[in-house]
């Protein structure tokens, strides 16, 4: 087993490498003057099982192309098999046609990764579980729920807790954390007038005098989560904590969160955004390297990955 890192999140790659006690493959990733990406593997990998770690985060197009070219380079270097470890699977939010003439980018990206030569994919908290079905190769979708549950049990002292889905689509995710914490569930009913905007219509469930934990997979502009937190406070919630796997945090998201009613936002390090959040006192980052490293180890040893979540 050998590991190679793309440029999207070298900090996470180094943590996973340290966890597995395996050095990263020596490689060169450069750009030509016109922006074309050039990748070269600088050591012999013939006959090895290779795990490439690369998030499809901002700049999403460059990082996706880097992933595809790296898979191709590994394939042409006679790797035995290639596992694409994609902590944050970008383009996953376009998983279906929401208008008559739109693309389904999640399916296209799945096709590209497979066609490039990947034999397996490992990712964390896919935006929609059915994206696994877009691939014709095995996909291991890891869950951050155990990490969040351990943190919440230590961090939140209240005995009157309820988990909240910020929209109907996130119900299963919130229910999973609620089950781990042995608490109930509420749902924020919202509509989205246009991308990046959300409007709360109703809150299903009693949140009065309760400590609310909003659970979601992605926080981008922050609008959905901030509006949900406001709605909960308006309906009598005592305080609002937020647990989200992927901190995209576009534009002014961090500033908006700092000024919001959110007591604490907890994200993982699937996306490298330390520079964005270093001055935000109410944003905390949990490491995902242990979970991902253990999954890689189990795949390499042909043992169960799903047992991690039992």
Regions found by a protein language model. Give the residues of each.
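PRPP-associated nucleotide enzymes
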Residues: 1-310
């Amino acid at each position: 087993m050998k590991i190679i890192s793309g440029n999207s999140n070298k900090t996470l790659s180094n943590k996973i490498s340290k966890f597995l006690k395996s050095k990263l493959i020596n490689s060169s990733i450069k750009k030509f003057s016109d922006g074309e990406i050039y990748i070269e593997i600088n050591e012999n990998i013939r006959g090895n099982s290779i795990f490439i770690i690369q998030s499809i985060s901002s700049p999403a197009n460059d990082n996706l192309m880097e992933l595809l070219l790296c898979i191709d380079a590994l394939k042409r270097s006679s790797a035995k098999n290639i596992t694409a470890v994609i902590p944050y699977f970008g383009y996953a939010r376009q998983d279906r046609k929401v208008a008559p003439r739109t693309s389904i980018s999640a399916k296209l990206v799945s096709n590209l990764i497979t066609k490039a030569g990947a034999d397996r994919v490992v990712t964390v908290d896919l935006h929609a579980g059915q994206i696994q079905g877009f691939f014709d190769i095995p996909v291991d979708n890891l869950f951050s729920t155990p990490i969040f549950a351990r943190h919440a049990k230590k961090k939140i002292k209240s005995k009157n807790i309820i988990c909240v889905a910020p929209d109907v689509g996130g119900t299963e995710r919130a229910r999973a954390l609620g089950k781990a914490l042995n608490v109930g569930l509420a749902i924020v009913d919202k509509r989205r007038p246009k991308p990046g905007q959300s409007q709360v219509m109703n809150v299903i469930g009693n949140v009065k005098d309760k400590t609310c934990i909003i659970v979601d997979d992605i926080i981008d502009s922050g609008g959905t989560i901030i509006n949900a937190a406001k709605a909960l406070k308006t309906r009598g919630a005592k305080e609002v904590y937020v647990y989200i796997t992927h901190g995209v945090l576009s534009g002014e998201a961090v500033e908006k969160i700092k000024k919001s009613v959110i007591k604490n936002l907890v994200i993982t390090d699937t996306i490298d955004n330390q520079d964005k959040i270093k001055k935000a006192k109410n944003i905390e980052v949990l490491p995902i390297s242990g979970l991902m490293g253990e999954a890689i180890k189990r795949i390499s040893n042909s043992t169960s990955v799903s047992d991690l979540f039992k």
